[in-house]
């Protein structure tokens, strides 16, 4: 008789149903939970950039639940494969990243992941790098790996098909990438991996290689992906439509308040721990007071990463600043030597190249720049500044001027 699923396993499946898209396969996952063995969960990251957002954290929180049941995360830093570049989701070839940058990104990635995962217990988490095996991998062994998979299978990938339609190049190292990622699963003896659906092709190759090489195939769980805070494309640093784990509590709250009303329920389901029954009741009330429930959502997102004092302070700051129109006291100071400025030059100095001239001009044209509460629409207007003057740019940026000697 098959061993029944215990209460902890049932609760885990119920919790995972909330954030998972697909499980390959559910029966295999249930058997894994019933087995009583410590599950080895592969979490592979190619550290092309050092930031994590709350979409990535969905996977981390699921792994945290598994850790709390005694299972082990193998935190795999793809330092070797990062040098190749994952073509996933790209219509062009990813640039090669220097090793020094990879190491720096990995450190920052781990720092942010520690906000969720248990890193301090070696029985619950182990850090590995795939350069451990690939840097010493022989050409003959690699050719054996290649011989197991067909060109037709690799080229069937949707992003490659899109490039073919556009008559754009596909480089050989990009086709090899999923083979290497798949082989990682075999080396680590992965029982389970939790990924975004965009990584499914690569991890299915992991199952394939495990079968070919005589190992039990890993279970794959893909997680739900929401639009970013702009309500359009998924969260991305390049689009600046994300809530980052590395963002301050203030930024997290402010960015949460940008979420479109129609996404409040989805964000509550996927990025918070509010019970589903309560979310169903909230869904019926949102249209009558969306601002109230958006603040509720912002608080619930913050609770996962910050303490109650921070949550309370950030809501008060937001309400004072944006509802009561009170200029905050703790705004940054820009120190300057001169009193006479062209408006755009002063604003440009504050942003220190993080915004282009065209972006800044557009802000002036939109009436989004003010000097001591007076709107400035002409970017080339000459202004005379003294210490304690306040410049506001957009809805959420202020800075105070301090003139040397004045």
Q: Each PLM stretch: what is its role?
A:
Residues 23-87, 194-200, 206:
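N-terminal catalytic cores of NTP/NDP-binding nucleotidyl/phosphoryl-transfer enzymes
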Residues 85-89, 137-143, 231-235:
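Short acidic, glycine/serine/threonine-rich loops at helix termini
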Residues 87-103:
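A charged helix-plus-loop insertion that forms the helical arch/lid used to bind
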Residues 59-66, 179, 203-210, 301, ...:
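Buried hydrophobic packing segments
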Residues 98-110, 114-222:
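Divalent-metal (Mg2+/Mn2+/Ca2+)-assisted nucleotide/phosphate chemistry catalytic cores
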Residues 201, 209-406:
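Conserved nucleotide- and phosphate/pyrophosphate-binding catalytic cores
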Residues 1-35:
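N- or domain-start disorder-to-order transition segments that initiate the globular core
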Residues 90-95, 144-147, 238-239:
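Short, hinge-like loop/turn segments at secondary-structure boundaries
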């Amino acid at each position: 008789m098959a061993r029944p699923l215990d209460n902890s396993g049932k609760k885990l499946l119920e919790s995972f149903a909330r954030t998972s898209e697909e499980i390959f396969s559910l029966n295999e996952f249930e058997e894994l939970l019933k087995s009583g063995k410590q599950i080895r969960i592969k979490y592979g990251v190619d550290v092309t950039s050092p930031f994590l957002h709350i979409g990535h954290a969905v996977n981390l929180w699921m792994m945290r639940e598994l850790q709390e049941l005694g299972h082990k995360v193998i935190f795999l830093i793809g330092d070797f494969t990062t040098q190749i570049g994952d073509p996933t989701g790209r219509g062009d070839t990813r640039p090669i990243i220097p090793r020094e940058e990879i190491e720096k990104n990995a450190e920052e990635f781990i720092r942010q992941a520690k906000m969720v995962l248990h890193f301090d217990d070696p029985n619950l988490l182990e850090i590995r790098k795939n350069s451990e095996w690939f840097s010493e991998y022989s050409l003959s062994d690699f050719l054996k790996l290649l011989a197991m998979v067909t060109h037709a299978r690799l080229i069937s990938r949707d992003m490659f098909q899109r490039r073919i339609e556009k008559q754009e190049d596909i480089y050989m190292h990009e086709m090899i990438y999923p083979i290497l990622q798949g082989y990682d699963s075999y080396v680590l003896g992965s029982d389970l991996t939790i990924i975004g659906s965009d990584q499914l092709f690569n991890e299915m190759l992991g199952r394939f290689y495990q079968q070919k090489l005589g190992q039990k195939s890993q279970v794959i769980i893909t997680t739900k992906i929401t639009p970013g805070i702009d309500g359009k494309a998924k969260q991305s640093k390049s689009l600046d439509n994300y809530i980052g784990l590395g963002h301050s509590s203030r930024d997290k709250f402010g960015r949460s308040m940008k979420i479109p009303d129609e996404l409040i329920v989805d964000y509550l389901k996927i990025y918070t721990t509010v019970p589903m029954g309560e979310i169903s009741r909230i869904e019926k009330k949102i249209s009558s007071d969306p601002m109230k429930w958006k603040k509720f959502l912002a608080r619930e997102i913050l609770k996962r990463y910050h303490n109650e004092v921070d949550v309370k302070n950030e809501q008060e700051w937001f309400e004072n600043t944006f509802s009561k129109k009170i200029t905050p006291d703790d705004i940054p100071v820009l120190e300057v030597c001169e009193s006479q400025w062209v408006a755009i030059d002063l604003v440009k100095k504050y942003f220190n190249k993080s915004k282009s001239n065209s972006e800044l001009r557009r802000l002036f044209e939109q009436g989004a720049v003010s000097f001591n509460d007076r709107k400035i629409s002409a970017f080339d207007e000459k202004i005379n500044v003294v210490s304690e003057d306040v410049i506001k740019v957009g809805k959420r940026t202020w800075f105070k001027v301090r003139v040397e000697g004045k």
